[in-house]
Amino acid sequence: MARSDGFSPRKSLRRSAREHSRSYVGQGSNDDFDDMYSPPSRRRGSGGGDGNGYTRSGRKIHHSRYYEEDYQDAISSDDERMYRPRRNSNSLTYRQQCKQAIDESKRIQKVPPAKRKRIYMSDDEEEFVETRQMENTAPDRPTRRSSRRMSSTHEEPDVLDQEDVSPIRRTRRTTIRFGSEPVEENMEVPRVLETNDMANEAIVQAVDNTENGETEEDVIEKIGREEEEEGDEEEAESGEKEQVGLLFHRIFNQAYLQEDEESSNAESSEESTAPRQYSLRRRQPVVQFNQSEARENRRARLEHHRAANANRHHRNRNTSNRRRRSGSDSDSDDMVLPRPDKRQSRPHMHNRGERERGRFMPINMTEKELQSAQHILMDRMRKTDAGQGASDIDPMSVDSSVGFDQVGGLSHHIQSLKEVVLFPMLYPEVFAKFKINPPKGVVFYGPPGTGKTLVARALANECRRGANKVAFFMRKGADCLSKWVGESERQLRLLFDQAYAMRPSIIFFDEIDGLAPVRSSKQDQIHASIVSTLLALMDGLDGRGEVVVIGATNRLDSLDPALRRPGRFDRELRFSLPDLNARRHILDIHTSKWEENKPTPETLDGIAEKTSGYCGADLKFLCTESVLIGLRSRYPHIYMCSERLKLDITTIKITEEHFGHAMRRITPASRRDLTIPSRPLDERTSILLGDIVKNLISLRIPQGYRCVENAMATASTELEQVVRALEPNLTVPAIRLLLCGSPSLSDGGQTSYVLPAILAKLDHLPVFSLSVSSLLTDGRPEEAFSNAVQSAMRASATGPCIMLLPSIDEWIKVIPVSVQHMLITCLESMTGFTPILFLSTLDSSFEDAPEYATEVFRHANCISLNPSRRSVRKRYFEFVIDGVRRKPKVFDPTIYEMPQADDDSPEAKPSRKLNDDETRELLKMYTALQRQMRMFFKERLSRLIRDRRFVEFVEPVDPEEAEDYYEIIETPICMQDIMEKLNKCEYNHADKFIADLVLIQSNALEYNPSNTKDGKLIRQMANTFRDAIDDMIDCELDESFVERIEMVSRMLQDAGVTPTSDQLLTEIPKGFSRKKPWTMANTLAKEIEQWKAEREAENEKLKEKLGISTDTAQSAIEENKSEEGTSSSVEEIKKKLNKKKKDQKRNKKASSQDPDGDDTEETEEAVAENNVDADVEMKETPADPVPTIQSSSSQEREIIVSADSITDLIKLCVEKSEGWSVSELERLSSVLSHTIERFRDEWNRENLPEQLAQIVREWEATDATNEKIANGKASNKNGIVFNGY
């Protein structure tokens, strides 16, 4: 008869024992669960009598925790999935049930195994086993590994994605697998691992029935003591463990049968045709205590708990009469689950916050250092009550070798950081005495590559030294940004809370302008909220304590102005480009560890002079490039060979030439945007303008602009530097300079050469350009001009700066009049002590300057550049024409010795760097692979030993039966010997094991003849033995498992790690990589032999290349010997020279633009032949030699050129260039240099001076050419105007 449709006040507790046992174990846990979800009137200690009562429908409530009667009608279908009815029909006490279970288990042990194996199996399990037997697939043995595999198959599909390291081939189905046996041999073991849930249910049921408050452990201990009194002591100890397992299974069977009975009764009641009461409508109960909201909350929590369990346990929810199966989630045999945490307020959010809070860890502290102060940190974290969650960022790793001693040219910044960070910790009494707060904010700004992040790294390492350690948090601007609303603010708050808990601490924001830009109406509201949060955290109502905030940015003007005030960012440190002294210091730091390969001080001084405009990052890269160039010039063979060669590092000398090659490869960071025309004078133009630039800087520019920190730069000791740092900087007046031409020459190179050279000398100062291109970029010149002037005024508040206005005469023609008036107003507003150098150029003389230029600059501010003097031009053209005397470069490979291979060098460092955790995991993996391989081989070898067909190969041959066996067979072996080797871990690869098995067959075939009956039989057995080996390896051994062992062994060798238990595959050479998969035919040794053969072939090809180049170069050297003797005839010399002329004709035809080039080439050939005759006559009659430039070595060939012709050419160039501008001289020298380069590979250059003189005679200056073009007279015989090249 169906019961009424009432609701009970204890309905929330109607859960099956399985649901309780999955989360809690023991009486205490169930009581906690009862107190959590029970009404106050039903809780323990709150009164309420014995708990008996009646519901509103008239049903009796018993004293037990669960109802006795079925309530299938009272709950919905959804509740049925969470709750399971349970009858408490046990009339025996807990001790009686345990005793009965022990007796039943003893009785079962006497039953034969064939009848015993199905006792602990349900109907579903029997059906499952029968299905697997029909598929001829034996289930795995319930070991730790197989139980984990079974649970992952039925419950966790994502575990199958992990890589299997078993040596068994997975593509074949075999009856016997590695690490498993047929199920019939193992069904005797109780299936404890698969019945954890039901056993836990039995424990809870037993605990519920315990008398006098005894727990499960007390009952089991009492049972154990009773058994010890009855039997032997040793049998009792072993039986105590077995009794617990048998007890679990006995109670499990009772509970399972009881559930099946209840399910069948429920189904039969549902199928009955009797009419149900209250079938027309549901009767809603009267809620007395308004528990609907609490009931919904409880249902939500239970639903969440059920969903969490569903992710781990796949249950069959469609069939109500089928037992819910769930395997163990752990590979442990322990049945006791951990007690739940008693945090009631959102424990999952608390755990998430604890986990994500751990990601905000300082970057300069090790794990051991954090654990030593863990109790203090945890106490602080409880007090701060920070948010929950953080950004998904791991702490950055910082190079611990970087310190303040590795930072050059920034001594003032280092002293300022010490005042902010170190002094408040070391000398707090000073701040306490004067009631002041130390600075808590510093912002680094300056161009890229000037050392902002480097100083932060050095500060992080300095903070971890000494007794008082400072936590250093390093975050980039984008790290704290998130797409979720409010997430960025929460992460900032959590970061500051973590820093406050670990105080004293430092927070470094790299590229802070991306995190806190200027707030405006055009900006997104999210960024404004982030900036507001950062402002409040840095200086809000609650002080941040001993937390220092450091920010770094390349654009200080883009930072929000609210951050740039005392209390937030107290100090602003500018990182400018290093000056001459700073560059010299940086070069000393980067070359200090080169030891004997370090360049000379004179070389470093020259490099520091030439690297004007280079930042610290550029100088570091310059040193790297120079070393690579030096390595290439000393050992070019490493570029042609992929293997490691043995190098003598001490022979690599880094010279100034190597630095020069590296400087041509590098473009400094300050010159890549081309906004500032800073360019030093090269060696050629310095002859013309070097003295002018030097005198101009020393005489017209004050000392304060040349060196900002002059007081500290001139100090001799560190103490003097610290004391003199308090001295005010030198007085720097406001200066205006106008570079213009002279009345005789308007273009003296003031805009193209002198102005960039001056900026290169003053590259440590910030430069603000007012050029036409910078003002007209966005079409709003007034706004661009205002921004540039305001930036210059702000920069002048902290130090000198430069305002640049090139070509003011052209600037006036393009820029609007409003901007011109703004410039005059700006210059008039500057006082005499505003440290701004206003530098401009004028492309004419001051007398011809526009009226506006004379208003801005007075005559005293004008510097006129006169034409170059005669002596200067003579030195200039001597430098240009000196290339005529330069000998052709002949490659001599004999000076480059081929280094030897260095594969087995003990000095070679590991090519793969692994940390301790990675090394430990790799060693663990290699040990596990070796162990699985040995287990696999032992099992297969045991199978071969048990095979009666191969009984002759099990034991060693008896010498009495075969007297000459050990004389004929060199390496006798049997399967017992192989098993002993396996036990001694002598096999680290499958090839060795297979080779020993094959050796048994080869020994049998070698000793036993084929003409005897016994010999034929043994030979047949040996061949069958070989077939069994091949079939076993081919069908059961996975080739990827063998390749995995090789790969892990090679990784350990590359990392320089040697395991203690197992041996590495020492036969694998360095650099080896398998090209074909492993098979029995393609063994590791065969693959290594093929790899070595290919490598030898590559070495032979390399030697052939080197041999061909050596022979060719040697023949060229022998051709160029001047001591060839009279045996060399004139015809041979003519043939060699004519051969070279023919090769040069192709280049001349391609580069020549003269239509009469063929006649010229024929004339050159005739002249060359005449020169050859003259050369031979000169060798035969040395009394009348041809005038040549003598070489320092008499054995080398001399260049055929006339010295008088070169002198006449230089004189012609000096006279022709009278009154020319620097630009015109540079154009002429470029044409002359190009012509000289065409003859760089020739020894006969006698006609070269005449060609150069012809170019100079026909050259016309730009001004004179323009006049002749206007008159129509400027043309040569070919119709080409020589106004350039």
Swiss-Prot record:
PROSITE patterns, sorted: AAA, BROMODOMAIN_1, BROMODOMAIN_2
Bromo domain segment(s): 928-1032
MF terms in GO: ATP binding; ATP hydrolysis activity; chromatin binding; histone binding
GO biological process: nucleosome assembly; nucleosome disassembly; transcription initiation-coupled chromatin remodeling
Protein name: Tat-binding homolog 7
InterPro entries from the UniProt entry: AAA+_ATPase, AAA_lid_3, ATAD2-like, ATPase_AAA_core, ATPase_AAA_CS, Bromodomain, Bromodomain-like_sf, Bromodomain_CS
Annotated spans, Disordered: 1-95, 121-173, 224-243, 258-359, 1100-1196
Residue spans of biased composition, Basic residues class: 311-325, 1136-1149
Start-end of Acidic residues biased regions: 226-237, 258-270, 1155-1175
Any single Gene Ontology cellular-component annotation: nucleus
Keywords from the UniProt entry: ATP-binding, Bromodomain, Nucleotide-binding, Transcription
The protein's role, per its UniProt record: Thought to form a complex that enhances transcription from repetitive DNA sequences by modulating chromatin structure.
Residues annotated as binding ATP: 446-453
Record-stated family: Belongs to the AAA ATPase family.
Top-level taxonomic group: Eukaryota
Coiled-coil regions listed in the entry: none
Entry-linked Pfam families: AAA, AAA_lid_3, Bromodomain
Organism of provenance: Caenorhabditis briggsae
